Amino acid sequence: MIKDLCTVVCRNKNLLMLVTAGIYILALYSALSGHTLLFSVLITFAFAAFLIKDYFKPKYILIWILIFYFGIYNTTSRLKDTDELLNLAPVNSVISGQILSIPQNKGRDKTSFFFKVNKIEYDGNVREFDNEKVLVTLNTNEKLKIYDYYKIKGRLSVPFKAGNPSQFDYGNYLRNFNVYAVFYGAKGAEPVFLNSDLSAREKVLQWINDYRQKIISTHSNYLSSPNLEILGGIVFGDDAVSPPENIKQSFINSGLLHILAASGMNVAFIFSFFFFFLSALKVNYKVNISAGIVMVIVYSLMTGLGASVVRATFMLVFVLIGKLIDRDAHSISLLAFVAFLMLLYNPMYINDVGFQLSFIVTFGLLIMTPFLMRGKNKFVNWVIGTVSIPIIAQLWVMPIQIFYFNNISLYSVFANIMSVPILSVISFGGFVSSLIATVS
């Protein structure tokens, strides 16, 4: 029976890629859990048994072993218990460096962002660094730009640690971003802009972010808070536009938080809009597809590159490249391959809730919706999809919601079913108004 199952895996590209990605993910979890030796022994013995029993071809066993141990190395080489800034904390200081993330307004005149620290001045001492980061929180609404350089006065501190097993550990959360300390700006002390030459890449990315900010500013002429942040979250995601905490909590309680996260629907809408627009202009098919790829990538950069957007962008780009070279993509294997690529680039994605939700929900939809939408009547399929997709998504997301948010709303499925048609209209209006804002 086991041999038959292994034979099926070897003959099915979807299952083969799924197993490969699963082995790599297992390696990451073994490294992050601190049980690397135990998992290594178990995996090695398991692969040896598969080889002896001739369940898999030797080349598969060799590839999987290499992937497993590379996953452990790739994770452990990036992990550290502390960094130089954490060793200095707590201390009043002045830091100089570069903003690395989109500055987010947290309400009540608070702005936060990740900051690369090049230099710190404290107690008459000066130290320079190559690659140290902190999460900065300032008491200001000053318009700060990603990739600009600043000097900031404040206090370097140790992030909050959990006091019991079920409590949120802020320090561990920041480790996912390779950040080990936090910095709070001094009251009344505005950040000082430092002149510095940006690279060509940084200038392009800053221009893209400025373009997004122009769109949001145009919307602010007609919308007030929190409607502005909600629309911005629907269009660009909460990585780019952060809604007020009370609004965000309401979406969490109702099981609608995904609405505020840019997702595959946004990416698909952007591509579809430009594809049909260029098709109406009789643009060459391959040129049309290529232009769509560029627009999708630009949009993903505008959103702040949240895990769900990166996943959707990668999948769509690979599908479109397949169209250009007349190749079809296998949905499950493509999803697994994209997960593998993202975790190869940054193993800490594995702890990102957005990453987990995006891939688990997409996987659930890919394996369940084809069985429900087999009919030939398009209207019937549309009705079935409208009702079943939110239910399927909620079923797959429920364990993660309980684990991270310690709650589950019984009406969330109904709320999702009701919100899908409305969300489509709001998204369409938001994207159209955003396009108008770019030319106004």
Language-model features, listed with the residues they occupy:
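Hydrophobic alpha-helical transmembrane segments in multi-pass membrane proteins
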Residues: 31-34, 54-64, 183, 243-413, ...
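Functional transmembrane helices that form membrane-embedded active or gating regions
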Residues: 2-21, 88-92, 378-395, 414-417
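General structural signal for alpha-helix termini and helix-helix connectors
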Residues: 217, 221, 236, 257, ...
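Membrane-interface helix/helix-cap signal primarily in integral membrane proteins
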Residues: 2-9, 64, 68-258
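Membrane-interface amphipathic/re-entrant loop segments adjacent to transmembrane helices
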Residues: 192-207, 253, 402-418, 428-440
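N-terminal leader/targeting segments
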Residues: 1-86, 203, 311
